[in-house]
């Protein structure tokens, strides 16, 4: 359904209300609005004109061309019944209210033409599509199926658009009506039968509601004869015969209420910044933000009143699931109670404004109003809706809808707001509290005449010293607007959020001015004003006059003298300025001339995500002698010195801000560190199996120097998650380096292939002559090593692919960011996405990889330590080889008669004999070890292969989720 404010008649009413007025005028004269209504009524629109609302400020006569007035509500018979109804301490009877309304002379005084001009209400769904309600015949069939005694069938016989509805009569009723002499008597009898049928249905609905324990408080009906919102006219008998409907071209009360609730139900979830009380930094939280399809008047009213309407949404969702067309009309069952609550909220806030400035005049003395009373009434509506929802779940959706529709029809008899009344009320009344809130805040801050920017700047002085010392105490903005909930209604949080956002932006721009602009050659001493062109960098078109500050708009002291229009301009000005300043703050973070956030991201990608592989390999190899030491004896200063040296000699030497990066020794092992970050409230570490003094390599991490205001984006939780990613990648890199050392060691032993079989003492008869001993004995060892290297390389390739995709996605988010909140939420989502994509949120993945990494390192150390010792050359072997080499170089003469070539050949044979003797000794030792450990290596291979298979299965299951 398109917005009701798109109608040209509504726009003309809106322009009339927003037109400039004289300073002496209080509100738009109702006669002008009524003239517009009558104008469109004469043009053929289906407009039901209602008399104007009585106002204590000005009395306006009804135009001459309007319809005759209908007898007022306060007739003796109706008032007696309503008074007795409101004073009754028992459960309120909806049928009694219907009877009182039906007996009022207004039901007979209304023209018959009105019955045919009932507008059609569009059903409001999520896409606002227009659907026609159920016909009266179908609804009566439903009610007949529910209870044939209480709801007899009434057929809706409609001959044309402008013909009335006639009930389907029984044979006895037809005979009785036919016996009447005149046509008027027969029509009166038909109307009486229809009224009795509706009353029986209402009594049946009330009986069902009473059985379910649903009661109505006295004020639900009694307050209606006190409220000046109640019109002097009543709805005709056709509203009882046929459900309340509405034409698309008409602006009626229940359509506005449905629009409000549709807006609230269509809420969008977004993120904003909130100060953490623990580390004094901004964290991302979730709030509900109303969509901006409709004007701010409807949005404000929705946020203010429907704070306890969860049960109503429960009913709506249940009905929508079963696709019942009555979806958008249940709101009317309690619309009158909502209007009463809204009105009393306005009186309560008007009383606050009157104490400060005396700008508002109360229309009537309504006794002492308190927030507690209003909250109690709202809670009563909430309880009623919960009970109705339970009733629908027990009786079924169709029957529950039928009962709710009858209850809605009964309650609507006591309302009758006209187009003008509802439109003026929603436009003029609902935005006033927004200005009064700022009025109260500024007044309580004892600066009633100052500009809001000065107000913010003065409040921020207490934070400057702490910021200079490296601390972030911007939570002053949240503390500044903490007001006792017992004195301020819940819906005031809306304006508080805008003010906190503007206050945060003011602090950031003041810091930018102090750090960059004031230190430049063109620095000026002009103070930064948030609500001026200097702060936003643009011309503020909304402030047409220099004296129209926030304080003057709150107080209504602008040039127009109209408090309502001043508050509308104020609310719009807050939103516009906040958007412009947020753009400037975002540029402050992204611009390379200032914070250069993209330059810091390059360091994060290169160091934390190890996008430059040569750096990490060089660092581990150069500092491995220190990294393998325990934490208690390692020298962290020497490790950091080697870290800085590797940066200068690697491809990262030209990165900006690389001096901010350094290595640290984390206090926890990786698995404890991971769980403490992901589950800080519930994780209890089990250190029974941990080493009391672990190696530095198992505790190594990174630390990036982040200062204010960069720490608003690179928060502590974000940097902790990035550090976890680095520690995990480091473990995989260390495993690869150790396996490569083992591979080099085994490659050196390939020269043992030259040793003949018969020279090996452990030579077995099972050896086949077509294979050398090195292939047979070393086959298992080589296969195990190759399997481990293949797994580590595949894992690293998978990580590079995942990290590249996450970086590309975050770069798109960075390009599309519109505010600092988008930047913060995007950075937080990026860090969480890295942890999620690598599978570190799964304990199974972490445990399996931890076991596989340990197996790789243990096997590598075993190969290196065992075979390097055996293959080392002893002193005797080295002395013999050196002697032979010296004889070859010096060319000493050999035996007499032997030529030079023969002498060299003799030396080479002698050298080969010495080397072969050494190789035979090494081969015997190596083969003995392999024969003894061949079973253990095969067992380790089986275990490792099972671990790899388990990891692949867990990853597949994790990706499927």
Curated annotation (Swiss-Prot):
<dbReference type="GO" id="GO:1902410">
    <property type="term" value="P:mitotic cytokinetic process"/>
</dbReference>
<dbReference type="InterPro" id="IPR041470">
    <property type="entry name" value="GCP_N"/>
</dbReference>
<comment type="subunit">
    <text>Component of the gamma-tubulin small complex (gamma-TuSC) composed of tubulin gamma chain, gamma-tubulin complex protein 2 (GCP2) and gamma-tubulin complex protein 3 (GCP3). Interacts with tubulin gamma chain.</text>
</comment>
<keyword id="KW-0282">Flagellum</keyword>
<comment type="function">
    <text>Component of the gamma-tubulin small complex (gamma-TuSC) involved in microtubule (MT) nucleation for the formation of median bodies and in the biogenesis of flagella. Gamma-TuSC may be required for the correct positioning of EB1 within the trophozoites.</text>
</comment>
<feature type="region of interest" description="Disordered">
    <location>
        <begin position="15"/>
        <end position="76"/>
    </location>
</feature>
<dbReference type="GO" id="GO:0005930">
    <property type="term" value="C:axoneme"/>
</dbReference>
<dbReference type="GO" id="GO:0051321">
    <property type="term" value="P:meiotic cell cycle"/>
</dbReference>
<dbReference type="GO" id="GO:0044458">
    <property type="term" value="P:motile cilium assembly"/>
</dbReference>
<dbReference type="GO" id="GO:0051225">
    <property type="term" value="P:spindle assembly"/>
</dbReference>
<dbReference type="GO" id="GO:0005874">
    <property type="term" value="C:microtubule"/>
</dbReference>
<dbReference type="InterPro" id="IPR007259">
    <property type="entry name" value="GCP"/>
</dbReference>
<dbReference type="GO" id="GO:0000922">
    <property type="term" value="C:spindle pole"/>
</dbReference>
<dbReference type="InterPro" id="IPR040457">
    <property type="entry name" value="GCP_C"/>
</dbReference>
<protein>
    <recommendedName>
        <fullName>Gamma-tubulin small complex component GCP2</fullName>
    </recommendedName>
</protein>
<dbReference type="Pfam" id="PF17681">
    <property type="entry name" value="GCP_N_terminal"/>
</dbReference>
<dbReference type="Pfam" id="PF04130">
    <property type="entry name" value="GCP_C_terminal"/>
</dbReference>
<dbReference type="GO" id="GO:0000278">
    <property type="term" value="P:mitotic cell cycle"/>
</dbReference>
<dbReference type="GO" id="GO:0097729">
    <property type="term" value="C:9+2 motile cilium"/>
</dbReference>
<dbReference type="GO" id="GO:0007020">
    <property type="term" value="P:microtubule nucleation"/>
</dbReference>
<dbReference type="GO" id="GO:0031122">
    <property type="term" value="P:cytoplasmic microtubule organization"/>
</dbReference>
<comment type="similarity">
    <text>Belongs to the TUBGCP family.</text>
</comment>
<dbReference type="GO" id="GO:0036064">
    <property type="term" value="C:ciliary basal body"/>
</dbReference>
<keyword id="KW-0493">Microtubule</keyword>
<keyword id="KW-0206">Cytoskeleton</keyword>
<dbReference type="GO" id="GO:0000930">
    <property type="term" value="C:gamma-tubulin complex"/>
</dbReference>
<dbReference type="GO" id="GO:0097568">
    <property type="term" value="C:median body"/>
</dbReference>
<keyword id="KW-0969">Cilium</keyword>
<feature type="compositionally biased region" description="Basic and acidic residues">
    <location>
        <begin position="55"/>
        <end position="65"/>
    </location>
</feature>
<keyword id="KW-0966">Cell projection</keyword>
<keyword id="KW-0963">Cytoplasm</keyword>
<dbReference type="InterPro" id="IPR042241">
    <property type="entry name" value="GCP_C_sf"/>
</dbReference>
<feature type="compositionally biased region" description="Polar residues">
    <location>
        <begin position="43"/>
        <end position="54"/>
    </location>
</feature>
<dbReference type="GO" id="GO:0008275">
    <property type="term" value="C:gamma-tubulin small complex"/>
</dbReference>
<dbReference type="GO" id="GO:0043015">
    <property type="term" value="F:gamma-tubulin binding"/>
</dbReference>
<dbReference type="GO" id="GO:1903673">
    <property type="term" value="P:mitotic cleavage furrow formation"/>
</dbReference>
């Amino acid at each position: 359904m398109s917005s009701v404010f798109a109608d040209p008649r509504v726009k003309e009413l809106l322009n009339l209300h927003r037109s400039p007025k004289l300073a002496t005028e209080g509100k738009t004269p109702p006669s002008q609005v009524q003239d517009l209504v009558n104008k469109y009524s004469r043009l053929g629109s289906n407009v039901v004109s209602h008399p104007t609302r009585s106002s204590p400020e000005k009395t306006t006569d009804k135009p001459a061309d309007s319809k005759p007035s209908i007898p007022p509500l306060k007739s003796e018979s109706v008032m007696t019944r309503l008074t007795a109804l409101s004073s009754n301490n028992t459960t309120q009877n909806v049928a009694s209210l219907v009877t009182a309304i039906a007996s009022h002379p207004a039901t007979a005084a209304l023209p018959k033409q009105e019955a045919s001009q009932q507008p059609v209400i569009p059903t409001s769904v999520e896409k606002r599509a227009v659907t026609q309600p159920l016909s009266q015949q179908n609804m009566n069939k439903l009610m007949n199926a529910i209870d044939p005694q209480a709801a007899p069938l009434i057929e809706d016989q409609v001959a044309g658009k402008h013909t009335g509805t006639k009930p389907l009569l029984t044979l006895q009723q037809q005979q009785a009506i036919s016996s009447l002499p005149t046509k008027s008597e027969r029509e009166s009898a038909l109307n009486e039968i229809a009224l009795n049928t509706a009353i029986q249905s209402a009594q049946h609905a009330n009986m069902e509601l009473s059985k379910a324990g649903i009661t109505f408080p006295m004020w639900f009906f009694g307050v209606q004869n006190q409220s000046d919102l109640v019109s002097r006219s009543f709805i005709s008998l056709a509203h009882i015969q046929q459900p309340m409907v509405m034409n698309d071209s008409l602006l009626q009360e229940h359509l506005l209420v449905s629009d409000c609730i549709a807006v609230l139900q269509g809420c969008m979830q977004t993120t904003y910044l909130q100060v953490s009380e623990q580390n004094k930094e901004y964290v991302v939280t979730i709030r509900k933000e109303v969509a901006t399809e409709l004007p701010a008047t409807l949005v404000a009213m929705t946020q203010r009143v429907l704070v306890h309407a969860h049960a109503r949404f429960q009913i709506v969702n249940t009905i929508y699931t079963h696709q019942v067309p009555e979806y958008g009309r249940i709101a009317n069952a309690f619309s009158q109670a909502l209007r009463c609550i809204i009105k009393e909220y306005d009186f309560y806030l008007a009383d606050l404004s009157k104490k400060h400035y005396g700008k508002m005049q109360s229309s009537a003395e309504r006794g002492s109003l308190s927030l507690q009373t209003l909250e109690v009434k709202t809670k009563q509506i909430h309880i009623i809706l919960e009970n109705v929802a339970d009733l629908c779940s027990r009786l079924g959706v169709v029957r529950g809808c039928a009962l709710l529709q009858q209850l809605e029809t009964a309650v609507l008899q006591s309302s009758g707001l006209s187009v003008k009344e509802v439109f003026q009320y929603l436009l003029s009344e609902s935005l006033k509290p927004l200005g009064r809130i700022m009025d109260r805040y500024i007044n309580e801050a004892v600066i009633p005449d100052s500009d809001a920017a000065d107000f913010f700047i003065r409040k921020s002085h207490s934070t400057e010293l702490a910021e200079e010392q490296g601390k972030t105490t911007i939570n002053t903005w949240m503390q500044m607007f903490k007001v006792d909930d017992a004195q301020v209604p819940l819906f005031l949080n809306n304006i508080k959020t805008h003010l906190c956002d503007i206050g945060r932006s003011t602090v950031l721009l003041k810091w930018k001015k102090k750090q960059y602009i004031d230190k430049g050659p063109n620095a000026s001493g002009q103070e930064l004003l948030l609500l001026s062109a200097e702060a936003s960098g643009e011309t503020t078109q909304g402030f047409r006059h220099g004296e129209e500050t926030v304080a003057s708009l709150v107080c209504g002291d602008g040039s127009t003298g109209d408090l309502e229009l001043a508050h509308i301009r104020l609310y719009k000005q807050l939103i516009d300025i906040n958007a412009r300043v947020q753009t400037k703050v975002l540029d402050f973070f992204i611009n390379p001339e200032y914070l250069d956030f993209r330059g810091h991201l390059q360091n994060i990608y290169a160091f934390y995500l190890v996008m430059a592989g040569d750096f990490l390999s060089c660092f581990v190899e150069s500092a491995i002698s220190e990294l393998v030491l325990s934490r208690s004896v390692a020298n962290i200063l020497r490790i950091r010195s080697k870290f800085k040296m590797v940066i200068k000699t690697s491809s990262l030497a030209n990165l900006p801000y690389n001096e901010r990066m350094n290595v640290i020794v984390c206090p926890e092992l990786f698995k404890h560190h991971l769980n403490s970050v992901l589950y800080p409230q519930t994780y209890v570490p089990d250190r029974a199996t941990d080493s009391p003094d672990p190696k530095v390599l198992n505790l190594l991490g990174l630390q990036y120097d982040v200062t204010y205001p960069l720490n608003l984006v690179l928060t502590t939780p974000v940097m902790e998650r990035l550090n976890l990613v680095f520690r995990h990648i480091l473990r995989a890199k260390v495993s690869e380096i150790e396996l490569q050392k083992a591979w080099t060691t085994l490659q050196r032993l390939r020269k043992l292939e030259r040793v003949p079989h018969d020279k090996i003492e452990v030579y077995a008869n099972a050896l086949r002559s077509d294979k050398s001993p090195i292939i047979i004995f070393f086959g298992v060892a080589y296969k195990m090593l190759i399997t481990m290297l293949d797994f580590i390389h595949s894992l690293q390739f998978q990580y590079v692919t995942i990290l590249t995709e996450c970086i590309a996605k975050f770069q798109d988010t960075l390009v599309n960011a519109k505010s600092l909140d988008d930047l913060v939420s995007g950075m937080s989502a990026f860090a969480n996405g890295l942890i999620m994509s690598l599978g570190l949120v799964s304990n199974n993945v972490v445990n399996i990889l931890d076991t596989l990494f340990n197996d790789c390192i243990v096997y590598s150390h075993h190969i290196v330590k065992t075979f390097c010792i055996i293959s080392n050359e002893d002193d005797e072997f080295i002395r013999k080889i050196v002697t032979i080499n010296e004889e070859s170089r010096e060319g000493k003469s050999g035996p007499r008669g032997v030529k030079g070539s023969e002498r060299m050949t003799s030396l080479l044979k002698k050298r080969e004999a010495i080397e072969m003797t050494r190789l035979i000794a090494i081969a015997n030792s190596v083969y003995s070890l392999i024969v003894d450990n061949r079973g253990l290596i095969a067992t380790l291979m089986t275990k490792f292969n099972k671990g790899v298979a388990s990891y692949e299965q867990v990853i597949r299951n994790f990706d499927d989720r």
